[in-house]
Amino acid sequence: MYKDFYASLKPLEGEIPYAEEERLAASGAPLLSWYRKNRRLLPWRENPEPYSVWISEIMLQQTRVEAVKPYFARFMEALPDITSLAQVDEERLLKLWEGLGYYSRARNLKKAAVCLMEDYGGQMPASRDEILKLPGIGSYTAGAVASIAYDLPAPALDGNVVRVLTRLFADPQDSTKPALRNKYERRLEAELVRRTEERDSYLSAGDDAGEVSTALRSEELFHPGEYNQAWIELGALVCIPGGRPLCEKCPLESLCLAHRRGEEEQYPVKPPKKPRRIEEKTVCLIEWEDTVAIRKRSSKGLLASLYEYVNLDGKKSAAEAAKELGIAEADIRETEDLPDAVHIFSHVEWHMCGRRIRLKRASGYQDKAVLMVCRAQLQDRYPIPNAFRVYTNILI
């Protein structure tokens, strides 16, 4: 009905026809119908308990769904509940997180788990406002957990949803500004509350418990978590970034102002990105027999408290690196040039060259900050960030 109605409208020059609230309300039915037919089967959707929803949402921040799947399975097997997460040793936690990046997410998970044990009896609170008080949880994650796990009418606005809505409304506002996100959260929350109240009124109007029970089992019944996930899924699968969206597959095609104007790729509006800073490094694999030198990074800053291979600023030959590290030529068995590697962070790029330095004796390299560890321990004990993956693969 809505599709036919909006398809008959003519775009108005210089203004958006119809209020955003009306356009949002008209989107609900086709969006949910599409989602129920096209949603992906994901492990965290199988049993949407508060803990698993929380862990998955934190992992999915800045990380692709396919990349998260094996990490989620491994994490849930090792730390299946809030109690085990609160008690885990930090190095063990970081090792489980190794490869996902943005390690502050893992540390905040543990901090939040400790808070849950101390203040909430080891349970995730069934309140968006209370969830929002936990370390590492922002508005999106709080809304996702509250709506998916507890069926509460709380919005969950991530980058996917922002992209869909800015195109739906042809919104010229800067999408990186809090004002736009706050506006959309209010719009979505009002729609969630309206639809949830309609559902509850329908259920309470049932004459007998049997009819109400049947309605509760019906897939046609409105659920806030499903509604939120439908917007996210549409942005991930159809209204995609970095090119032309798949408008011909979109259930909101005839409702979308950007599509009607042929301006899909102009939204969302963002300021130009600042170029990333480039840092050159020489990564040294200093080996003696089956051991390799690693050291722990600072507890603050990039890759805080993780382990790394010895490295130097700038690009240096093996001989130059050995000299700078105080390794005598007489203590070197052999050297080897290793492949170059590039790792991109949000604000900086590391351009690395690798140098292998094999020692004749254990005492050939002296540094109190360095540990000589067995290669096998790189796999099961010490968390080495993905930035050094090329060099870790050489060792294991």
Label each residue range with its predicted role.
Residues M1-L41, E46, T196-L221, A236-I396:
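Intrinsically disordered, low-complexity, charged terminal extensions of DNA damage-control enzymes
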Residues Y2-L12, I16-E21, P30, W34-P245, ...:
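Catalytic cores of DNA base-excision repair glycosylases
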